[in-house]
């Protein structure tokens, strides 16, 4: 997944929910803007769940769904 694509999804206004599937089979759904964080270069993103935070390397993203 290209960093530019992820940045576009995260920064679009208004925010629209989307999900990702990783190369290890894990899936994460970003339902609102506060569910995701990233440094300025977007080479990693952070998923903020109810009781967890997961660091995700954007190179491990295979699919974006629900855009």
Segments from the language model and where they lie:
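Motif-centric detector for short Cys/His coordination patterns
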Residues: 1-67
């Amino acid at each position: 997944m290209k960093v530019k694509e992820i940045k576009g999804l995260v920064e679009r206004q208004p925010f629209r929910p989307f999900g990702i599937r990783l190369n290890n089979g894990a899936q994460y759904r970003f339902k609102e803007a506060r569910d995701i964080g990233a440094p300025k270069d977007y080479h990693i993103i952070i998923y903020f769940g109810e009781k967890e935070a997961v660091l995700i390397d954007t190179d491990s993203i295979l699919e974006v769904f629900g855009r």
